[in-house]
Each structure stands twice: as structure tokens, then as C-alpha cells.
């Protein structure tokens, strides 16, 4: 295990996040398990409060090695598709056989998903400093149909950058969405890091 990768992601030592996740893929699960990464299970449990049909198709945006899908499955969700920018992460997720479909995409192009295809989209530990920029928020949100749910998190490093929380406030204030859930809690316990978990419903 290379414990330095958690430091590198927050210090954004890689210009292209694909390079970071290429190098991190083999040790990613072990490093996050040893540091007690809790945001995925917090988000999955929160979703259960608002979803009655757990067989509803979910898009796990930025699925990585599948840690978020594992949390979702542990909470009873069963039909999950994943997309990510890292081939190396996708291959590890594929070996777990927990996704219906997996696809790697180019972050410099449009997200390869049809509008209204999924009524639930998750982006758990994805939109943050050192990973997907806040500019991707609207593109992901726009894929949802009316009444669709967007479950996502911002870690505390991202919460220190005003544009992250302001994006949520703007989306709600412009009556594009209603906020169903917002909770600050543990993100990576061994690093004493926190994250905010959100669930918003598209109007």
C-alpha cells in the first residue's frame, strides 16, 4: 500500500486526475479501507430514506473501483451502472461483478449517458478538489428526469472552496431542485476528514 496517494489527491500533485487514478488503482481499495472511508455507506443509507423501489436503475458517476456500488448493494440497491475516467479503476470494478454495465469515458467530451435514462445518479467522493471539477455538476444534474435524485458528496477540502456549496445553493434557489438531505459526517475516519452528503430532487 502507498499511503501517500491520499495526500497527493488533496494536494493535486497530478495535473490530469487520470494519471493519479492509473497509479493508485492497485492499492486504492486497501488504502481507503485501512483509513476507513465512510462516505459511500453514509450516502447509500441516506438514499434508502427516499427510494422505495431499490431495483430502480442507478448511475454511479465516477464509480472508480466500485466502492460506492458495494455500499449501495449492502443497502439493498441492485441495478447499478458505472462510468469513470480511469480504465485501470474500471477494470478492478469489473472483476467484482457488481455492475450491470461499466464504461470508461473521456472527461474532455460529453458524458456518454442519455438524458432521463436514470432517475437516480450518485457521485460519491467524485466532485472535489483533485478529482472532478465543480463545473461537471450541472452536466450530471441535467441528465436526470423531473423528480430524479442526485446523491453526492463534497469532502471538507472542497467545502473550503466557496463555489462548491454555492453551486448547491444556486441550484436550489433557482428552483431547479429541492434539497432532501444534507449531513456533515465522517469521510475518512483515520485522517479525521469529514464530508457533506447531499441528496437533491430535480424539479
Annotate each language-model stretch with its function.
Residues 147-155:
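Conserved beta-strand signature within the Rossmann-like core of class I S-adenosyl-L-methionine
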Residues 29-44:
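Conserved SAM-binding loop and adjacent beta-strand
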Residues 189-203:
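Core SAM-dependent methyltransferase catalytic element
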Residues 59-111:
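Class I SAM-dependent methyltransferase SAM/SAH-binding core
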Residues 135-146:
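A short glycine-rich, Lys/Arg-flanked "PGG" loop and its adjoining helix->strand segment in the class I
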Residues 111-121:
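A short acidic, Gly/Pro-enriched loop at the edge of an enzyme's catalytic core
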Residues 119-133:
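A short SAM/SAH-binding and catalytic strip from SAM-dependent methyltransferases
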Residues 1-26:
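N-terminal, positively charged/glycine-rich alpha-helical extensions of SAM-dependent methyltransferases
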Amino acid at each position: 500500500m502507498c499511503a501517500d496517494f491520499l495526500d497527493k489527491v488533496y494536494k493535486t500533485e497530478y495535473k490530469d486526475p487520470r494519471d493519479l487514478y492509473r497509479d493508485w488503482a492497485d492499492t486504492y481499495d486497501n488504502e481507503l479501507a485501512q483509513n476507513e472511508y465512510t462516505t459511500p455507506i453514509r450516502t447509500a443509507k441516506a438514499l434508502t430514506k427516499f427510494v422505495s423501489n431499490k431495483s430502480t436503475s442507478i448511475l454511479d458517476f465516477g464509480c472508480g473501483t466500485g466502492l460506492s456500488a458495494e455500499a449501495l448493494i449492502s443497502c439493498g440497491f441492485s441495478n447499478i451502472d458505472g462510468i469513470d475516467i480511469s480504465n485501470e479503476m474500471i477494470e478492478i470494478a469489473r472483476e467484482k461483478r457488481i455492475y450491470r454495465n461499466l464504461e470508461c469515458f473521456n472527461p474532455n467530451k460529453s458524458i456518454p449517458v442519455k438524458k432521463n435514462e436514470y432517475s437516480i445518479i450518485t457521485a460519491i467522493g467524485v466532485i472535489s478538489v483533485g478529482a472532478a471539477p465543480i463545473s461537471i455538476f450541472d452536466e450530471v444534474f441535467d441528465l436526470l428526469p423531473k423528480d430524479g435524485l442526485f446523491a453526492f458528496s463534497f469532502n471538507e477540502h472542497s467545502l473550503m472552496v466557496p463555489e462548491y456549496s454555492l453551486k448547491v445553493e444556486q441550484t436550489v434557489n433557482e428552483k431547479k431542485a429541492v434539497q432532501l438531505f444534507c449531513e456533515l459526517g465522517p469521510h475518512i475516519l483515520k485522517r479525521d476528514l469529514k464530508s457533506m452528503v447531499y441528496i437533491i430532487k430535480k424539479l
